[in-house]
Each structure stands twice: as structure tokens, then as C-alpha cells.
């Protein structure tokens, strides 16, 4: 009997090839992408790249997500195949095959299927390994090299990972067969889904969950809070989506059914009845499509925005070729430090700037009345932050004259409470706003770390910086010095001396010999190399994660159409016999498919719209400061996804119609 199962295993794969083709394609892509991620993560060449540790850590995270997503996709595809083969397995049982024989047969099927698909996936991954590595180098703006990257341990690791996944499939298949008799197996596919319970309660809980998730996304004020609440909001939205699809669609269809004018139309009656019949299955499938579609949109929008913003972000943190910041030092020290380093290396200084400024955080705010944190006070969540510059430094940065005296100040404000106001109060000191600036005047002159931490930052320009400080002896206001220079050396030359510059700063610190006095700095070209590695890696991961999520989306849609086509075929045959013509059948099919498969897309766009504010704040920490660019990128990704979704819909609905009209 067990010899018979060997023959049956092979013949079943051939006979059910229409079910196994998309399953094989999903496994093939999952294995290929997983192999490529593992190969890049363990590639010793990446460790040699400037910033290689960061990119390997980023790829490691992507590797984990890809593995998890691949496992879920393979599990879903296997579940669909087994559900659609349940009648076949039941008939085998009725013909005399025992459960152990059925388990043995399905085990052998998966062994053959797994060897072919996993082997092919590893082969394709190894074939494109060099090309993908070169693509990653290109994204990281490094010299592209086609070098051998084959690693035996990567092949073994992928085999172990997918071996465990397929062992899980074998266990689940055996469990399915063991808990059902032959009659139950033969009827499993044809049995309708159970009507959901507590639908009003589910609808209320789903609405509340989705509402709270949207509220968190819309009301978050700063990037740090956005990071901490992001996953909570995501879980709430996912939970709410599943509940609303499960209960909301049922309630909606029941309302349509009660509307006699609408329901008792041939096309409407058939569509609504079919959806109600398979309510639970439709709900889970549709919610899954909505969530996967949202993942594609968010991942690609974020990754593309990060990649496009890399150049502007570099200049925000590194406005000069060589920069140095210090505390408790003098402007003359920084000026001398930069000049000496340039002289030692034989560089000609094209431009050099040295500034002193202060910064402070606001503990409480009532309109234009602000209270600065006191020294030693815990500054967990400031209301807003200020950078304060001397009038002379403002004039040097902008080339524009500014006449301030007494308590007059110039103001650049992002905080809504002080923007476009004539005066503001800091502690008990009132200042008159003589001039408000609309342009961020420190760009290309002084690095602004607050730009990436909060959207709520401000600049003050005062007549005399020291006189301003003397008014707040007990407040936590911090002195900062910055110096920067641009030189006539090429980027390649500057990159060679990047480590020397770091050592030069360390040597300078050792000479200070005073506690609390120190300097730190970086070179633009070195920071750019590390940022390019990070941003290019993130974009690379975003592309491949989007591919995985898209494969999952297509798989769910395709299998859903195929399974519903087989389930609907017999009912449409009956309807044809009672007088429904081909035109009415086509109209009914189109209405049902349109209703079912464009609802998830609508939810995906809705989720993205509500998540956009929170996403933009999170991306700001990573360096996406150009909001206009991000909006254009997001809308472009949505347009591309819409086109892809419509194409998928057209292809899968054609398969559905062919099955129904057979």
C-alpha cells in the first residue's frame, strides 16, 4: 500500500498542477528572496564597507521579516491547496486508504514539491547573487563590483529554515487528515462557513479599535512619541480591520438583503447571497488583502522617501566638509583647530565659519508664556525647543543687517503658540519680537539636531548672547560652539583622512585637560558614506519586503478567486437552467468581484492616509525632512499600486469567469 502512495504522490502533483503552480511560484520567490537576504547579511565584503556594521544589522532585521513573511505565505498557500483537495482525499479514504496512508501520501507530495521548489529557489538566488550584491552597492553609492559571493553556510541555513517550514506543513496536513473521517474530508470544501456570532459587538469593538488606532496616528506630536506608539496603532488597526470585515460586511449585506427593491434584482440577489454564504471566509481573506496592501504602500513609500532624502539630510547634520562642535571651549580654539588641520594636510580653505549659540527646552507653555527647564530637572518631554544666536552671527550667516537692542529679538518659529506673535515671555522675562524670519537661516551654516527629533523647534536672535544668558542663571540653557570649513580637496582625498581627523580631535581633547571641556566632529564625506550605506540598505530592504508582501497579496487574491469560482460554478449552472443568460451571469460576476476585491484597496488607502502623519514624523528621525517630496512619493506609489492591483484583478477575475462558465 505504501508503494501505491509513492505513485499517487507524483500523479497527484501532476493532476492538481493548477493548484500547485501558484503555490510553487510563491515558494520559489520566497526561497529566492530569503536566500538573497541571507547571502547579503553574511557577506564578508559588506563588513569591509564604511558603515558595513550598520548595513549588516539593517539587513539582519530585513532577513527576519522576510523569513517570517515567507513562512506565513507558504502556510497560507498550503492551507488553500489542502482545503481544495479535501474531497479528493475523502474519496481516497472511501476507496480503502487508511489515514496513515493518506498522511504518508501527502508527506511524500510535500517532499517532492519541496525538493523541486526550494532547490530551484536556491539555484535562482545563487544565479542572481552577484547582480543583487552589485545592485545593493549601487544603491549605497559605492563602486559596483561583480564578485563571487556564493557561501555554503547560506545554502545550508536556507535549507534548514525551509526544511522546518515544510515540516510544519507536514504536521498541519497530518493533523487535518487525522481529525476528520473520509466523509468529513469529502464534504469540507463544499461546506458553507458558519455564521459569525456577536456581530453587533464585533462591529462596535472593530470600530473602537480602528478609531483609537487612527486617533493615535493623527494626534501624535513628535517623532519620539510616534516611534513608541507606532506598533500599538498598527496592532489596533489590524485588529479593527479584521473585526470590521468579519462583522461589518455581514451587517452591511443583511441590510441590503432587507432592502427588497435592491435585493430582489437577479444580479443583486445572486451576488449578495453568495457573499453571505461564505461570509467568514470572505472577511478573513479581504482583511488579509487590505493589511498586505497597506504593508506594500507603507514600506515602499517609506523606503523611497528615505532614499530620496539622503542628500538633504546629510547637509542638515554636516553643513561643511569638516565640522567640529564643542562645549566649554572658545571660538578661537575651534578656529585654530580647523586651520591647523588644513595646514597639516596642505588643504586650501575655501570657507570657514565659527559660531557660538545656546539651546534650551521648554517645560511648560501657555500661549506665548514659556517656562524653561531648571538645572537638574528631568527633561523627558519638552513642549518645544529653542536655539539662540547672537545678532552678529546671524548677520554673518545671512549677510543681512539686523538692528536689535534691549529685549528685542528676532524669531524663526515652528511652534504655533509663538508663531506670528509680537512678544513672548521666557520665565519672567518678556521679549519683543522685532522681526520674524520665514527662512531657516542656519541651513548650510550650523547643524540642527533638533530638526530630526521634533517638528517643533525655534530660533531666537538676540542683541548680545552673553547678556541673554545672564538673565537665566538657574535655567538649563546650554552653551554650544560649532566650527566648519570647506576645502579644495576631492571627496576621495577627504575620505582617506576621515579617521585621521577623528584622531586629531581626540588629541585636541587630551590637550584640554579640563573636565567638561571637549570637542567632537565629523567629515561630510565620511558621514555621507555611512548614510548612503544605511539609506541604500533601507531602500533595498523596502523593495524586497514589498515584493514579498505583493506576492502574498497576489496569492491571496488568486486563490480566493479560484476557490470561489469552483464554489460558484455549480450554483451558476443551476441559475442558467432556470433562465439566467450569459450577459446576466457576466454582470453578476463583475459586480461580485468588484465589490469583494476593491474594498480592501479602499481600506488600504484609508489606512495609509491616517498613518501618513505618524509615518512622516518617524521618517523625520531617519532623515526625511522634505515633506513635499514625501507626499509626491507616497501618491506616486499609490498610483503604481493601483495600476498593479487593477491588473491583478483583471487576470484573476478572468480565471474566475472561466471556471464559473465551464
Language-model segment annotations:
Residues 3-7, 179-193, 566-570, 657-662:
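Short cytosolic juxtamembrane segments of multi-pass membrane proteins
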Residues 112-256:
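Hydrophobic alpha-helical segments
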Amino acid at each position: 500500500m505504501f508503494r501505491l502512495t509513492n505513485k499517487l504522490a507524483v500523479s497527484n502533483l501532476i493532476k492538481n498542477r493548477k493548484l500547485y503552480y501558484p503555490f510553487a511560484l510563491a515558494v520559489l520567490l520566497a526561497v529566492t528572496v530569503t536566500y538573497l537576504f541571507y547571502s547579503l547579511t553574511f557577506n564578508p565584503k559588506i563588513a569591509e564597507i564604511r558603515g558595513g556594521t550598520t548595513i549588516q544589522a539593517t539587513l539582519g532585521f530585513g532577513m527576519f521579516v522576510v523569513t517570517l513573511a515567507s513562512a506565513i505565505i507558504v502556510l497560507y498557500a498550503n492551507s488553500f491547496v489542502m482545503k481544495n483537495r479535501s474531497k479528493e482525499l475523502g474519496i481516497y479514504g472511501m476507496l480503502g486508504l487508511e489515514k496513515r496512508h493518506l498522511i504518508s501520501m501527502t508527506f511524500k507530495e510535500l517532499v517532492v514539491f519541496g525538493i523541486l521548489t526550494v532547490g530551484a529557489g536556491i539555484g535562482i538566488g545563487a544565479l542572481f547573487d552577484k547582480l543583487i550584491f552589485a545592485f545593493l552597492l549601487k544603491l549605497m553609492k559605492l563602486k559596483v563590483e561583480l564578485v563571487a559571493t556564493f557561501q555554503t553556510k547560506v545554502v545550508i541555513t536556507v535549507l534548514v529554515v525551509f526544511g522546518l517550514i515544510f515540516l510544519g506543513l507536514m504536521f498541519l496536513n497530518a493533523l487535518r487528515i487525522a481529525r476528520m473521517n473520509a466523509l468529513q474530508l469529502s464534504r469540507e470544501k463544499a461546506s458553507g462557513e458558519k455564521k459569525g456570532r456577536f456581530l453587533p459587538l464585533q462591529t462596535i469593538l472593530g470600530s473602537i479599535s480602528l478609531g483609537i488606532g487612527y486617533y493615535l496616528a493623527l494626534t501624535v506630536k513628535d517623532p519620539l512619541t510616534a516611534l513608541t506608539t507606532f506598533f500599538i496603532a498598527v496592532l489596533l488597526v489590524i485588529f479593527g480591520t479584521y473585526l470590521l470585515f468579519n462583522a461589518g460586511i455581514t451587517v452591511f449585506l443583511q441590510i441590503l438583503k432587507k432592502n427588497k427593491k435592491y435585493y430582489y434584482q437577479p444580479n443583486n440577489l445572486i451576488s449578495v447571497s453568495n457573499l453571505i454564504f461564505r461570509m467568514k471566509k470572505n472577511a478573513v481573506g479581504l482583511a488579509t488583502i487590505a493589511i498586505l496592501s497597506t504593508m506594500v504602500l507603507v514600506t515602499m513609500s517609506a523606503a523611497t522617501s528615505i532614499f530620496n532624502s539622503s542628500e538633504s539630510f546629510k547637509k542638515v547634520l554636516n553643513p561643511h566638509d569638516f565640522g567640529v562642535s564643542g562645549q566649554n571651549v572658545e571660538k578661537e580654539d575651534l578656529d585654530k583647530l580647523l586651520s591647523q588641520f588644513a595646514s597639516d594636510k596642505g588643504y586650501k580653505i575655501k570657507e570657514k565659519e565659527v559660531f557660538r549659540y545656546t539651546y534650551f527646552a521648554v517645560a511648560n507653555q501657555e500661549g506665548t508664556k514659556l517656562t524653561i527647564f531648571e538645572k537638574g530637572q528631568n527633561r523627558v518631554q519638552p513642549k518645544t525647543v529653542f536655539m539662540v544666536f547672537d545678532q552678529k552671527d546671524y548677520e554673518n550667516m545671512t549677510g543681512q543687517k539686523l538692528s536689535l537692542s534691549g529685549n528685542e529679538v528676532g524669531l524663526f518659529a515652528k511652534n504655533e503658540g509663538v508663531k506670528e506673535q509680537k512678544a513672548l515671555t521666557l520665565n519672567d522675562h518678556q521679549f519683543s519680537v522685532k522681526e520674524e524670519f520665514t527662512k531657516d537661516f542656519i541651513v548650510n551654516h550650523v547643524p540642527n539636531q533638533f530638526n530630526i527629533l521634533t517638528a517643533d523647534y525655534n530660533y531666537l536672535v538676540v542683541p548680545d548672547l552673553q547678556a541673554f544668558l545672564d538673565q537665566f542663571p538657574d535655567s538649563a540653557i546650554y552653551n554650544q560652539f560649532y566650527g566648519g570649513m570647506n576645502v579644495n580637496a576631492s571627496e576621495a582625498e577627504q575620505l582617506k583622512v576621515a579617521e585621521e581627523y577623528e584622531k586629531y580631535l581626540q588629541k585636541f581633547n587630551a590637550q584640554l585637560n579640563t573636565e567638561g571641556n571637549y570637542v567632537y566632529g565629523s567629515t561630510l564625506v565620511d558621514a555621507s558614506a555611512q548614510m548612503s550605506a544605511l539609506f541604500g540598505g533601507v531602500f533595498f530592504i523596502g523593495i524586497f519586503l514589498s515584493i514579498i508582501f505583493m506576492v502574498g497579496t497576489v496569492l491571496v487574491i488568486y486563490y480566493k478567486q479560484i476557490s470561489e469560482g469552483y464554489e460558484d460554478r455549480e450554483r451558476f449552472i443551476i441559475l442558467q437552467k432556470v433562465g439566467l443568460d450569459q450577459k446576466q451571469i457576466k454582470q453578476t460576476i463583475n459586480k461580485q468581484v468588484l465589490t469583494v476585491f476593491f474594498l480592501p484597496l479602499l481600506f488600504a488607502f484609508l489606512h495609509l492616509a491616517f498613518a501618513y502623519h505618524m509615518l512622516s514624523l518617524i521618517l523625520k528621525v531617519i532623515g526625511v525632512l522634505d515633506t513635499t517630496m514625501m507626499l509626491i512619493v507616497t501618491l506616486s506609489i499609490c498610483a503604481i499600486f493601483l495600476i498593479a492591483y487593477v491588473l491583478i484583478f483583471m487576470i484573476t477575475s478572468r480565471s474566475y469567469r472561466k471556471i464559473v462558465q465551464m
